[in-house]
Curated annotation (Swiss-Prot):
The gene is sts1. It holds the Pfam family Cut8. Residues 52-63 have a biased composition (Low complexity). Involved in ubiquitin-mediated protein degradation. Regulatory factor in the ubiquitin/proteasome pathway that controls the turnover of proteasome substrates. Targets proteasomes to the nucleus and facilitates the degradation of nuclear proteins. This is Tethering factor for nuclear proteasome sts1.
Length: 314
């Protein structure tokens, strides 16, 4: 059954759009009869004309920078587990692990000990004192909490770290003595700090427990005497005269209870010999103090500043 479908009416705005489209089509320029396709001979003539004409300005030539060659690490075709190389392995070891490894290697191969001794850098005063102060810290931390720190019980508790500190002192002190150490200033600097460590050792109520402390004073006193004699031979005893060691050693002797008196006498005899026979003849402390003050004034450049200057005939 055929049915007629009525065409829906067109909205008014569609008519307006069609009028605008017609107007745009009418404003399109028309092609003139003179416009035609270019032929091959026209292109050739135009090319010859452009080639014959000299350009007004040459284009600037900009060099092209080539990309720099990168060091690309070649990738391994096959990835598999492998141990670390020696440099990387040493980077992972701390100080204690490295020391233990070297110690075990020297025990298994005694020939390596001499090579390590000659290859390792020479210990300095600061590095040696750092080790000694670490032993001193271990000793202080081993004391029991509360109670009498000078009792026999406390001595038994700290006996092991005390022995380690005294052994370290006995081992490090000869290293800084002549002839192994040729600089008197280095030897004196070490002895000054090492004596302070001995002053800090605990004093026990039982006299028998103080034998180790007294032995440490005897050893350090002998070391002082050896260094003083060697320093007196070098440079006219300059280190002993102007380093203030007379006052420092006197203070150490006072803190030790007179256990360094032999070193004080040795230093006084060396300084008296340097000052001449007049100083030894007087023998009093006033003469030494006067000479010391004159030396200090000469070194500081203030000698004679307070003395009035005569004006006129002499």
């Amino acid at each position: 059954m055929n049915s007629l479908v009525a065409t829906p009416p067109v909205p008014p705005h569609f008519y307006e759009y069609s009028r605008l489209a017609s107007a745009r089509q009418m404003s399109t320029p028309t092609v003139t009869p003179n416009s035609r396709k270019r032929k091959a001979e026209d292109d050739t003539a135009d090319h010859d004309g452009r080639m014959s004409a000299s350009p007004t300005s040459s284009p600037a030539f900009t060099p092209r920078t080539l990309p720099s060659a990168r060091n690309v690490k070649r990738t391994r075709p096959n990835i598999s587990g492998r141990p670390l190389s020696l440099p990387r392995l040493l980077e992972t070891l701390d100080t204690d692990a490295l020391r233990g490894m070297l110690r075990s290697m020297c025990e298994r191969h005694p020939s390596l000990a001499d090579e390590i001794v000659h290859t390792a850098p020479r210990p300095s005063v600061s590095s040696a004192l750092q080790v000694l102060r670490q032993y001193q810290s271990n000793l202080q931390s081993s004391f029991p909490l509360g109670g009498n720190p000078a009792s026999d019980y406390a001595y038994n508790r700290v006996r092991q770290p005390l022995g380690q500190l005294l052994d370290a002192l006995s081992d490090f002190t000869p290293h800084f003595l002549p002839p192994n150490e040729t600089q008197p200033s280095v030897s004196l600097s070490y002895l000054d700090d090492a004596t302070e460590i001995i002053h800090a050792l605990p004093r026990w109520s039982t006299p028998q427990n103080n034998i180790e402390r007294d032995s440490a004073y005897d050893e350090i006193c002998k070391a002082w005497i050896l260094v003083i004699r060697e320093a007196a031979k070098r440079g006219g005893g300059f280190q002993l005269q102007y380093g203030g060691w007379e006052q420092k050693l006197a203070k150490h002797n006072q803190n030790s209870g007179g256990k360094l008196q032999a070193a004080v006498h040795e230093l006084a005899s060396c300084l008296g010999w340097m000052h001449g026979p007049d100083t030894q003849a007087y023998g009093g402390s006033g003469g030494n103090n006067d000479l010391g003050s004159i030396r200090e004034q000469l070194l500081s450049g203030t000698y004679g500043l307070g003395t009035p200057v005569k004006v006129g005939p002499w």
